[in-house]
């Protein structure tokens, strides 16, 4: 079940990024092409090239008739959703930046306590945001307000807040449970690309994958002793 949730989370984030990227590319290309064609119209007219000027003007009229004003608004909405679900993904994979200078100076029991305290605080905060966000979405639903360009229901736009925060709260609890059980935190290596040079990397003598974080030195993880 968790694998399905993880996969759905990744697919959603990838789809949001891809859609926003394509929209921005098309919008910028359209804007600059419109300017270039307008310059060509003036150039052809200045050199007495009537036929070319007429063709360029016709192309300019066609391009100007393509309305992409809504693209900016949609991109903003996509980035809002991307940020909320991306934050939850960051908790699950350990991408978020953490300041661990003081934590690493503590002994193992205190380090463990403060890590769990931090994860619990993150779950509490995001849970509060999810609750407040749900109330706000309900208020926007009854207000029946819409966005300026796309005229989308604003409650649908703001739905990213309770949904993303709820998922982030769940991820904090998931990481806290995993840490309490195994003493390990998810850790993302920024110099590592999935599927590239992964052979024999992060694998111990028994073939188990290690996900140790700077917050979880190996002295926190007690490996079973062979009888």
From Swiss-Prot:
Q: Which GO terms describe its molecular function?
A: transmembrane transporter activity
Task: Answer whether the UniProt record assigns the keyword Transport to this protein.
Answer: yes
Coarse class of the protein's main subcellular location: membrane
Record's GO cellular component terms: plasma membrane
GO biological process terms, semicolon-separated: C4-dicarboxylate transport
Q: Where can this protein be found?
A: Cell inner membrane
Transmembrane regions listed in the UniProt entry = 8-28, 68-88, 113-133, 150-170
Q: Which Pfam families match?
A: DctQ
The domain of life for this entry's organism is Bacteria
Q: How does it sit in the membrane?
A: Multi-pass membrane protein
Family to which this protein belongs: Belongs to the TRAP transporter small permease family.
The annotated subunit structure for this chain is: The complex comprises the extracytoplasmic solute receptor protein DctP, and the two transmembrane proteins DctQ and DctM.
Q: What is this protein called?
A: C4-dicarboxylate TRAP transporter small permease protein DctQ
């Amino acid at each position: 079940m968790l694998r399905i949730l993880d996969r759905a989370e990744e697919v959603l984030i990838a789809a949001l990024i891809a859609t926003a990227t394509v929209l921005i590319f098309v919008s910028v290309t359209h804007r600059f092409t419109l300017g270039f064609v307008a310059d060509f119209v003036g150039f052809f007219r200045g050199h007495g090239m009537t036929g070319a000027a007429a063709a360029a003007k016709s192309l300019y009229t066609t391009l100007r008739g393509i309305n992409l004003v809504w693209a900016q608004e949609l991109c903003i909405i996509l980035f809002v959703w991307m940020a909320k679900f991306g934050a939850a993904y960051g908790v699950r994979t350990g991408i978020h930046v953490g300041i661990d200078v003081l934590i690493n100076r503590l002994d193992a029991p205190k380090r463990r306590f403060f890590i769990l305290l931090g994860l619990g605080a993150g779950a509490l905060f995001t849970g509060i945001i999810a609750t407040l966000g749900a109330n706000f979405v309900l208020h926007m639903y009854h207000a029946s307000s819409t966005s300026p360009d796309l005229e989308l229901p604003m409650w649908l736009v703001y739905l990213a807040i309770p949904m993303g925060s709820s998922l982030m709260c769940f991820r904090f609890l998931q990481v806290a449970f995993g840490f309490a059980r195994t003493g390990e935190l998810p850790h993302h290596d920024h110099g590592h690309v999935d599927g590239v040079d992964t052979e024999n990397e992060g694998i111990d003598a028994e073939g188990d994958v290690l996900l140790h974080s700077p917050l979880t030195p190996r002295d926190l993880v007690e490996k079973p002793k062979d009888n």
